[in-house]
Amino acid sequence: MLFGVKLANEVYPPWKGSYINYEGLKKFLKEDSVKDGSNDKKARWDDSDESKFVEELDKELEKVYGFQLKKYNNLMERLSHLEKQTDTEAAIKALDADAFQRVLEELLSESTELDNFKRLNFTGFAKIVKKHDKLYPKYPSVKSLLEVRLKELPSHSEEYSPLLYRISFLYNILRSNFNTASEPLASASKFSSIVSNDIDMNFRSFKFWVHNDNLMEVKTRILRHLPVLVYANVPSENDDLVNRFESDISNNDEIVGSSSSTSSVEHGLGARSFDPLINTLYFDNEHFELYNDKLLKLNSAPTLRLRWTGQLSDKPDIFLEKKTLIEDEATGKSEFDLTKLQLKQKFINGFIFEGDKKFKEQTLKKLKESGTAGRDLERLEEDFSEIQNFIIKNELQPVFRTVYTRTAFQIPGDDKIRVTIDSNIVFIKEDSFDRERPIRDPNTWHRTDIDANVANPLKFLRGGEYAKFPYSVMEIKVKSSLDSSMSASSMISNVKLPKKHGQWLNDLTNSHLVKEIPKFSIFVQGVASLYGDDEKLDILPFWLPDLETDIRQDPKQAYEEEKKKLLKQKEIQKKIDGMRRLSNLKEPQHQAAVPVSQEENERITSQGDLEADGSSDEETEQEPHSKRSKKVRRRKPKATFLRILAGRDPKLMGVDSEEEEIELPPGVKKPLNLLKNAGPVNVEAKVWLANERTFNRWLSVTSLLSVLTFSIYNSVKKAEYPTLANYMAYVYFGLTIFCALWSYSIYMKRVDIIQQRSGQHLDAPLGPVLVSIVLFVTLVVNFVMAFRNAAKSRQELQIQNLEVPERIPEVLRPLQNYLFKLMGPSSD
C-alpha cells in the first residue's frame, strides 16, 4: 500500500489538520514531472525550489510536533487533575466511579491515537526526505537537516511509558475501591488479593509477536485489565524481570530503541525510559549443544545466562542463572527449575573460566557468620558447584548478548495472569570461537568495548556483529493448580483460561494485533539470527520464514476470520456432544464399544481450533492423538502379509490413518488439488538424503551380486560340479536384476510420496526379505548338491576298488559319513 493511501486511511478525524501534508510536499518535489522526463522549465529543480521545499518541510515539522507537544501536555494535565481527585481517602469515597472511568477511557484512547499520530508523521517525514534525495541526488541531502530539527523538538523523544504508568495507577484505584466499575475492571482481582501458598501451582506460557505499529494499542488494551508492574530493587526468585525501575538508555540510531511503539531507532535519540533495559548474556559452546538440545526438544534442556539491568558501568547486580524447563509430556504443563547466583563483576572471570572457588568460599563464610541456617548454606554450596561443574563439563562460554526493554503487567500479589512485552530486541555477538580474531577477549566474560563508560557505546558494533529482531515479543503466563485439566496444546486458543481474564485475553490473542508463535525462544532466535549459516546448527527454528512476511492483518479480515472460527468451534462442539450422547446410549447394548472420553473430546476440539486458525509447524506431544477423523469411514480390506511386505498397507492396522476414505455429503466432490499441496515442497534435506542413501546401498548390493554372478559363470568349466555352478549363476543373475528394479521402483515411489506430502508409510520390507530368502535357499541347495556329488564320486571309486582320498582329519570323518548317509549314497 502507498504511504499516501495509508496515511489517509489511518488519520484520526479530529486531528486531521495537524498531520503532515504529505501530498503537498510531494507536489513541491515535482515528482510527476521528473518521472515523466519533461524538459519544461517549470519541471526543473533549482536552488529556489530547494529552499522553498526546505522551508515548507520546516513548517510542517513545527506544525506536527507543536501539536504533539500540546496534546501530550494536555494529557498530562488531565491526568494530574484526576490524580488530585484521588489523593485522599475522603476524595476517593466521594468519587463518581462511572464518570472517572469514562475520562480514563478517553485518556487511554487519546494516548493510543497520539502514539499512532507520532509514528505516522515520523514515517511521512522520513519518506519525503528519502524521496527528495532520490529525485535530486545533485543537491545536498536534507536527511541531516531533518535529524537536526528533530533534536530541537523536545516532543519527538517523548516517552509514552509515563502516561501508561500513571493511567495504570488510576485504574488500580478503581479496581481496589469500587465494585460498580465496568465488567473488565470489576472482573479483575483486587489490588491486595493474594494467592494461597498451600496450593501447588504451575504455569503455561504463550508467546506472541507484536508489530511496532500495534504495540501501543496492545499495551493500552492490557492496561484496562492489568496494572503495569513496577519492580523493587531486588527481584524475587520467581521474577525474571530485573531490579531497576528506571534506566538511562544509550541508543544507537540503527540498533536500540525506546520502549514506545515508535522506537528511537527511527529517531536516533536517547530517551529516558520508565521500562527497564535488560542485558542477558547467553552461554553455549562451539558446537552449540545447548541450542540444539533446546530446539530438538530434548527434555530438561538447560540454558545458562548472565543477567543485569542498565549499563554495566553503573555496577548493577549481576545474576548467573541456570534455567531448565521441565515439561510434562502427558499434560503439556511446564515448570522451571531455576538455579540463580548473584555474582560480583571482579569474580566472574575466575568463576567461569578458571573454576575458582574463592568467591564461593567468601560468600559462604559471610553467610555463616551472619547466622544463616545450615540447610541454606548447603543448598547454596550445591548451587555454586552445580553451575560451575555445568560450565566446565560442557565447555561453555559467553556467546551472544540480548538487549531489550521490558514492560510487565500483573496485579500485585496475584500471579495467576502475567503479561510481559519485550521490545527493541537486539542480539549482539560476544563469542571467541575464532582464535585469531575473537569478537570478545577470550579471558574476559564480556565485551569491554560496548560496556565502556562512554556515550553511545553501541556505535562500536560492526556489520554482522548484531541483529535486530523486527517485532516485540509478548508473553502471557497463565498459572493454575496442578490438578487443573488444562489442554496440553501449545496454542492459547485451545486452553481453558481463568474466568476473570478469559474474555479479554481471548479477544486480544485472537485479534489482528498479535501473532501467536508457540514455543518461541529469545535464546534460540538469537543463535539463529547471528549464527544461522554455521554448519554446527543441526536445525533452525520453524518460525524463521514468518520473519520474512508482514504479520500485520487487516482488522476487518481478522474479524471475519474470527467469526468463522467461533462458528466452526460451536459446530464441532455440537457434534462432539451428539457423539457423546450416542455412545452413552449404545454402551449397554454393545459392551465392546469404547466410549468417547472427555480427554479425547478435548483433543478433537483442539484440533478443530487448529484447523480453523491455521496450523503452526510446531510439533506437540499430543499431535499423534489429534489426527483422528471425525467422519464415518468406509471399511477397508484387511492387510495381508504380502501387502505389508510390499509397503502397500501400514503395519499399524489398529491406528486410524489420514489416508482413510471418508463419506462426503451429497453434491460435494473430492478436490483434485489439496490446499496442503498448493505451496512449494518444503522438506528437510535429511529426508531426501535418507532416501538417496537407501538407494545407493541397494545399488551396492546389486553390484556385489553382479560380481558374484559373473565370477561363478566364468569359472563354470573349472568347477568340480559345472552343472550346479551354471544353475547358481543364472539364479544370482535373476536376483541381480530384481535388486536393480526393486531399488529404483522403491526410490521413485518414496520420492513421489514426499512430493505429494502423503502420510503413507515408507516401509517396504519385501525386497530385503526376498533377497535374504533366495540367498539362503541357494546356499542350502549348493551345500546339498555338492555333498551328493561328492558321495556319488566316492561310491564310484569304491566300486572300482580304488583308494578313496580322505581330505579331512580323522576326527571329522564320523560327521562326514553321517552327512553322506543323510544326503547321498552310503560310504559303506
Swiss-Prot record:
Gene3D superfamilies: VTC, catalytic tunnel domain
Segments in the Cytoplasmic topological domain: 1-693, 749-766
Region described as Important for inositol polyphosphate binding: spans on this chain: 127-134
Ranges of Basic residues composition bias in the record: 627-636
Annotated segments matching region Disordered: 580-636
Modified residues (Phosphoserine): S182, S187, S196, S264, S583, S615, S616, S626, S657
Keywords: Cytoplasm, Cytoplasmic vesicle, Endoplasmic reticulum, Membrane, Phosphoprotein, Transmembrane, Transmembrane helix, Vacuole
Residues covered by the SPX domain: 1-146
CDD domains: PolyPPase_VTC2-3_like (cd07892), SPX_VTC2_like (cd14480)
More details: Present with 2915 molecules/cell in log phase SD medium.
Quaternary structure note: The VTC core complex is an integral membrane heterooligomer composed of the catalytic subunit VTC4 and the accessory subunits VTC1, VTC2 and VTC3. The complex exists in 2 different sub-complexes: VTC1-VTC2-VCT4 and VCT1-VTC3-VTC4. The VCT1-VTC3-VTC4 subcomplex is mostly found on the vacuolar membrane. The VTC1-VTC2-VCT4 subcomplex is observed in the cell periphery, probably ER and nuclear envelope, but localizes to the vacuole under phosphate starvation. Each subunit contains 3 transmembrane helices. VTC1 is a small membrane protein without hydrophilic domain.
UniProt protein name: Vacuolar transporter chaperone complex subunit 2
The organism of origin for this protein: Saccharomyces cerevisiae (strain ATCC 204508 / S288c) (Baker's yeast)
Upper classification of the organism: Eukaryota, Fungi, Dikarya, Ascomycota, Saccharomycotina
